[in-house]
């Protein structure tokens, strides 16, 4: 993959299908919560796909993200989305992404977690009731299912574990309420989980193998999707918005074994993984058959990601320093 510039280019590269979808959008796109892990890359991908105007909104407590977005051609607005006056002052647009969310550090900050994950999305949908809205939620709203299964489907019952997951389900319920009340077309996207070379479960496992650290097998299976694929899918979702709100799982097609990831990484790195514990019979997994049926297959699969990741780690590539906590079964992050 090379350096971070090459990584960013790959993550923000629009597919032909994305270019076609963006060409059909007849107005400005607003990205709320554009300063997180996915926001800056989504904004750049939309611009590269030909979007005439993309406005990125965040508190931008880290000026690096705002500078980056200004450089790639976005219009940036610094705003606290929990401030009603600030939210109402944002421009009227026909297309909105809601990416704002609070996961890591949520334990001990429960009030902020619920405000960000539940109250804020509902207020955003109310504010943009005349727009089409892609709302990014989480697969954590589902219960654990058998590791041998294909994962939870969109129509399956939810049963969130822990306050983070509960707050995400709360956000979904209030967004659905606002969508139904105002006839606002929305798609709620349940992500399990975006991965790139500086962050993600594959990154965590490969890094631990390389450094000789223990790898906990208690959460023995997981889904991952290359972040570039996730962003391309999201850029094509506005036609899928509906009222009542539609729901779509966003993840890769493979159920990955943490043990197998570690063992394959060990072979490629020439190191023996240090595995501890045993796989539980259940894991947090999502079924993406509906996604593939509507929007097609991912472009990047696990084997390709693993090869890139091993090279990245061996060459000392930078990490975001944000462990996923994939092994946690308590729902506390």
Regions found by a protein language model. Give the residues of each.
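N-terminal Rossmann NAD(P)H-binding glycine-rich loop of SDR-like oxidoreductase domains
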Residues: 31-47
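Amphipathic terminal alpha-helices
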Residues: 2-22, 28, 302-333
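NAD(P)-dependent short-chain dehydrogenase/reductase
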Residues: 149, 169, 173-229, 265
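Short-chain dehydrogenase/reductase
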Residues: 114, 118, 150-156, 160-172, ...
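NAD(P)H-binding glycine-rich loop region in Rossmannoid oxidoreductase-like domains
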Residues: 40, 63, 68, 74-116
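Mid/C-terminal beta-alpha module of Rossmann-like enzyme folds, strongest
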Residues: 213, 220, 233-290, 330-331
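Conserved glycine-rich Rossmann-like NAD(P)H-binding loop of the short-chain dehydrogenase/reductase
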Residues: 51-64
């Amino acid at each position: 993959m090379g350096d971070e510039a090459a990584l960013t280019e790959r993550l923000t590269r629009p597919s032909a299908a994305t270019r076609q979808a963006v060409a059909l959008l007849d107005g400005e796109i607003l990205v709320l919560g554009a300063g997180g892990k996915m926001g800056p890359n989504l904004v750049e991908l939309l611009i590269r796909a030909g979007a005439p105007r993309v406005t990125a909104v965040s508190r931008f407590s880290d000026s690096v993200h705002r500078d980056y977005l200004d450089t790639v051609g976005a219009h940036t607005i610094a705003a606290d989305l929990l401030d009603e006056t600030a939210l109402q002052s944002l421009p009227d647009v026909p297309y909105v992404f809601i990416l704002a969310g609070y996961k890591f550090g949520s334990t001990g900050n429960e009030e902020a977690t619920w405000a960000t994950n539940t109250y804020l999305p509902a207020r955003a949908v109310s504010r943009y009731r005349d727009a089409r809205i892609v709302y990014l939620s989480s697969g954590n709203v589902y219960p654990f299912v058998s590791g041998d299964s294909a994962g939870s489907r969109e129509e399956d019952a939810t049963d969130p574990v822990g306050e983070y997951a509960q707050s995400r389900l709360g956000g979904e319920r209030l967004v659905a309420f606002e969508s139904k009340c105002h006839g606002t077309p929305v798609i709620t996207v349940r992500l399990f989980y975006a991965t790139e070379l500086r962050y993600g479960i594959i990154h965590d496992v490969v890094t631990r193998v390389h450094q000789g650290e223990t790898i906990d097998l208690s959460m023995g299976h997981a889904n991952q999707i290359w972040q570039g694929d996730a962003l391309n899918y999201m850029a094509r979702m506005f036609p899928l918005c509906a009222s009542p709100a539609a729901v779509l799982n966003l993840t890769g097609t493979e159920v990955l074994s943490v043990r197998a990831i570690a063992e394959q990484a060990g072979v490629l790195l020439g190191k023996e993984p240090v595995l501890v514990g045993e796989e539980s019979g259940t894991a947090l997994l999502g079924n993406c058959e509906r996604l593939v049926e509507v929007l097609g297959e991912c472009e990047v699969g696990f084997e390709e990601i693993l090869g890139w990741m091993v090279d990245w780690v061996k060459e000392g590539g930078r990490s975001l320093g944000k462990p996923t906590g994939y092994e946690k079964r308590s729902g506390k992050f």
